[in-house]
């Protein structure tokens, strides 16, 4: 007998287990049984002459005679052969290709009747199967020959003719699994049946009252029904239970991480009424909003505790997150600690340095003429600095002269040593992973875990906050400071109203004549950046192409500058400095300006091919304007028809400035895998059944259960549920994205 935690090689043997591990990363019985079917076939119906052509990706079964065969060497292994066979003829002619085919060429010969089963594809209108499962029918020796999985079913049927074998397949119910050319759906089904035949009854890790509350069937019944139940209603109930399991596994992983951090010692730093933080509050030329004061109080209390703070601060573009973070960092500096602010780009890091020095004034001039008596110093460390500059900044960090250091990934290098690191602030968290923020926290003194504040201007739906950022407490700033100007957003459907695009260029000229500035944003840098070009789809605008055209055509009378991610750091700094100083009227750019760029005089943004951007991305871009004293306008130009899904998305962005509402819409539009990102090895982190957009009730209930259950963790089955979210040699932590 077997349990869920048993290794597959003990149950299936080394050959099958190794194949499942290599193709899908399955190592335990639990791994295999949670590889759920993606569809079901009520009898393996044959594709015949009168049938409608199946869709690409559909699982089909074909019974026909081989009319042609062709063998050829494999490209990477010339000593091995590939075999291509053709079955049937006319409209439903199908070709099937087999790799490493030396061992099957004697079976798959011309005029042989064969059953093929696999996913159909198309090439130039012709149906194709790639390494399908096969079974030879009516072989001369009377024995069944073919793929092991189909052969075992045929042997078990004890049919005495090929037609009776086919009838057996047509009678039976089969699940269809996500598969590969090396391990096909039939192979997986055979392994699943073999495992379920010897699986001990699975004890349920969820209490009966929780199952009853949500109408969930027992774990043992669900794991068997999802694979074997012929009743659709029972399979649906199994999916509901296993979806809840996934929510529990995910939350257990996050709660475990959170508890691990809470057991560590944090640097206690109480608020000082005579410190730098209090002095900055007195000097600010504006009043904090009620929301900012509330968040600052929460942060201040957390920093004063002897446990590390782990908090996510999210807020609308321009809601004032940075000043709250600066006040929190100064509270740590007042207690003798250093703070590190990690930014995803050099442009954003330089912007933070400038704005923090500006707001601190003499409070950031420690050791300098004109500096306040208890002033600190603020430094910048980026990869593009010269070796001498980096060496000097590293020395100042190591000596403790610098209280706040702002940097990019350069802060993570081994050469960077802190004198007394007490707090890490990560801006735009979605650009970093858990490993990177932990790498920076590890630079603190032995026995101390620095406080962590993660900031994002990308509003996060509740279900994402409970999953991707589930190991962090959450604070939200919704209120915008007084003085923020309204931003009118309009969609230009160029095919319908080409004159509107001409009017957009004139609007930019008018704003420049009034002394104001504009952004023109493109989705690509140049023609070599073809990530969004598809057959039959109009290529999108490029920053370099627009820059070249506009300065000699529509905007020839204005001063233009170009900025994108492939420019050198010096060129980017020069373009940004000229734009900030008012020496440039229009900045033609890519999304390199998506976060952190603050030019109050910019009042117009024209986004070309806006349908190529995500909903949240457009909202972020729009936040670069409306920062000064003048009303602003954002124009979204697109060549898609208004009534398409892409056109409707653009209208949704234009219809609201509520980033949280747009974030919910963005989540519904995207796949969960896109939300969760990829792990460090590049494998997509996806949810199998759980939907962040549809299963909020399950996620909240699972979180509440895990928080309570973790106080006295006794059932190892809960940790097993969480294994694929925590196992460092497979998926890594879920939020390492």
Swiss-Prot record:
Record keywords, A-Z: ATP-binding, DNA damage, DNA recombination, DNA repair, DNA-binding, Helicase, Hydrolase, Isomerase, Nucleotide-binding
Single Gene Ontology BP annotation: DNA recombination
Organism in which the protein naturally occurs: Mycobacterium tuberculosis (strain ATCC 25618 / H37Rv)
UniProt protein name: ATP-dependent DNA helicase RecG
Motif (DEAH box): 397-400
Comment on bound cofactor: In vitro unwinding requires a divalent metal cation, Mg(2+)=Mn(2+)>Cu(2+)>Fe(2+)>Co(2+).
Outcome reported for the amino acid change (mutating residue 627 to A): Wild-type HJ DNA-binding, severely reduced ATPase and DNA unwinding activity, reduced ATP-binding
Family: Belongs to the helicase family. RecG subfamily.
Pfam (any one): RecG_wedge
Induction text: Very slight induction by DNA damaging agents mitomycin C, UV light and methyl methane sulfonate by 24 hours after induction (at protein level).
Subunit structure: Monomer.
Protein's UniProt keywords contain Manganese: no
């Amino acid at each position: 007998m077997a349990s869920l935690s048993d290794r597959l090689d003990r149950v299936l043997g080394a050959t099958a287990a190794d194949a499942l591990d290599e193709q899908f990363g399955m190592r335990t019985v639990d791994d295999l049984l949670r590889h759920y079917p993606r569809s079901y076939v009520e009898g393996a119906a044959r594709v015949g002459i009168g049938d409608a052509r199946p869709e690409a990706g559909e699982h089909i079964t074909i019974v026909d005679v081989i009319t042609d065969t062709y063998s050829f060497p494999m490209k990477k292994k010339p000593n091995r052969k590939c075999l291509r066979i053709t079955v049937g003829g006319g409209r439903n002619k199908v070709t099937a290709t087999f790799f490493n085919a030396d061992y099957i060429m004697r079976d798959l010969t011309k005029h042989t009747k064969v059953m093929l089963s696999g996913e159909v594809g198309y090439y130039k209108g012709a149906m194709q199967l790639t390494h399908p499962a096969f079974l030879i029918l009516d072989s001369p020796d009377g024995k069944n020959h073919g793929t092991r999985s189909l052969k075992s079913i045929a042997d078990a049927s004890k049919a005495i003719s090929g037609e009776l074998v086919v009838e057996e397949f047509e009678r039976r119910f089969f699940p269809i699994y996500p598969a590969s050319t090396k391990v096909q759906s039939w192979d997986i089904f055979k392994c699943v049946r073999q495992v379920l035949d010897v699986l001990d009854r699975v004890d349920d890790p969820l209490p009966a009252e929780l199952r009853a509350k949500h109408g969930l069937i027992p774990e043992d019944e669900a794991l068997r029904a999802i694979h074997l139940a012929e009743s659709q209603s029972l399979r649906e109930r199994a999916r509901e239970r296993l979806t809840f399991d996934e929510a529990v596994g995910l939350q257990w992983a996050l709660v475990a991480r959170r508890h691990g951090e809470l057991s560590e010692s944090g640097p206690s730093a109480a608020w000082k009424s005579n410190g730098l933080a209090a002095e900055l509050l007195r000097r600010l030329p504006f009043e904090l909003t009620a929301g900012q004061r509330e968040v600052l109080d929460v942060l201040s209390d957390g920093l004063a505790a002897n446990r590390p703070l782990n908090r996510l601060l999210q807020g609308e573009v321009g809601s004032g997150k940075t000043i709250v973070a600066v006040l929190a960092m100064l509270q740590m500096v007042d207690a003798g600690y250093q703070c590190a602010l990690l930014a995803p780009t050099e442009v954003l890091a330089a912007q933070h340095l400038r704005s923090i020095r500006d707001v601190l004034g003499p409070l950031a001039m420690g050791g300098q003429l004109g500096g306040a008596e208890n002033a600190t110093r603020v430094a910048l460390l980026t990869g593009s600095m010269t070796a001498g500059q980096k060496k000097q900044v590293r020395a100042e960090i190591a000596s403790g002269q610098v209280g706040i250091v702002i940097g990019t990934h350069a802060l993570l290098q081994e050469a960077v040593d802190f004198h007394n690191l007490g707090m890490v602030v990560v801006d735009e968290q979605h650009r970093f992973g858990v490993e990177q923020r932990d790498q920076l926290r590890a630079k603190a003194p032995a026995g101390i875990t620095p406080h962590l504040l993660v900031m994002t201007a990308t509003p996060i739906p509740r279900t994402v906050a409970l999953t991707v950022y589930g190991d962090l407490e959450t604070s939200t700033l919704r209120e915008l400071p007084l003085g923020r100007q309204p931003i009118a957003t309009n969609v230009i459907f160029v095919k319908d109203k080409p004159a509107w695009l001409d009017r957009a260029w004139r609007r930019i000229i008018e704003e420049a004549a009034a002394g104001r500035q504009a952004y023109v944003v493109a989705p690509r840098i140049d023609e070599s950046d073809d990530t969004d070009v598809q057959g039959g789809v109009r290529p999108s605008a490029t920053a370099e192409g627009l820059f070249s055209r506009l300065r000699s055509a529509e905007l020839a009378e204005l001063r233009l500058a170009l900025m994108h991610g492939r420019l050198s750091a010096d060129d980017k700094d020069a373009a940004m400095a000229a734009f900030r100083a008012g020496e440039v009227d229009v900045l033609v750019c890519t999304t390199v300006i998506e976060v952190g760029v603050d030019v109050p005089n910019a009042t117009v943004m024209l986004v070309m091919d806006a349908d190529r951007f995500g909903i949240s991305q457009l909202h972020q871009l729009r936040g670069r304007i409306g920062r000064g004293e003048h009303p602003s306008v954002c124009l979204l130009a697109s060549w898609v028809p208004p009534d398409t899904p892409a056109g409707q998305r653009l209208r949704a962005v234009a219809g609201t400035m509520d980033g949280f509402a747009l974030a919910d819409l963005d989540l519904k539009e995207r796949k969960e895998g896109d939300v969760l990102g990829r792990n460090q090895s590049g494998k997509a982190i996806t949810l199998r059944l759980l939907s962040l957009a549809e299963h909020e009730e399950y996620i909240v209930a699972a979180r509440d259960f895990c928080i309570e259950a973790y106080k006295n963790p006794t059932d190892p089955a809960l940790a097993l549920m969480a294994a694929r979210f925590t196992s460092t040699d497979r998926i890594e932590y879920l939020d390492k994205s």
